Amino acid sequence: YNVFYHYVVILMNCFYICLVNAIIALIVMQKYSIWFKYTFKEMLIIGIAGGTGSGKTTVVRKIIESLPAGEVVLLPQDSYYKDSSHVPVEERQNINFDHPDAFEWSLLSKHVMMLKEGNSIEQPTYSYLTCTRQPETIHIEPREVVIIEGILALCDKKLRNMMDLKIFVDADPDERLIRVIQRDVIERGRTAEAVMERYTRVL
């Protein structure tokens, strides 16, 4: 069984690599072909969605690494969580942050439209520890490629209609859980117990 599982994991990883490469090839073909430039607008907008821990960040990183430096803008959907500073601290942990209502879709759509029109934006920042929006923002200039990445990046119809390419990333549930625990404990300062409880409750 262990040997079989080992080979299955290898095959899945190979398939994953091939899939990412195919996506990158499609992006390059669309963005830099004469047909694309005459058929679509100059800016290419990509939406990448998928469950937590599914590998969205890896796909995004591979895309950015494969395109010319300085040509990609990343808009993480997590940056557009609604501010929860008005909610008592003890109640914030009960908020389902994987529900569409947790995001400020209007602001995200507005920022994408501003970038399309050639304007810069001030991207909000969000703290996973306090579950609140931070006063600091990130100045973003329009680029050739805009990537919108998040668990529900393809959920909102208005935002989805702005996208030229839509990608959904999936992975085995057990593998996703391992990735989520590693990420949230190391990068977001949460305990393994808290991650497990949240994973079984809302993810």
Task: Give short role names for the model-derived ranges.
Residues 52:
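The conserved Walker
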Residues 56:
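Conserved lysine of the Walker
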Residues 59:
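Hydrophobic positions on the alpha1 helix immediately C-terminal to the Walker A/P-loop
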Residues 70-85:
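Short beta-strand-centered segment that lines the nucleotide-binding/catalytic pocket of NTP-utilizing
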Residues 87-128:
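Conserved nucleotide-sensing/catalytic segment adjacent to the nucleotide-binding pocket
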Residues 135-186:
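ATP-dependent NMP and nucleoside kinases share a basic, alpha-helical "lid"
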Residues 186-203:
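Small-molecule kinase domains that catalyze NTP-dependent phosphoryl transfer to phosphate-bearing small molecules
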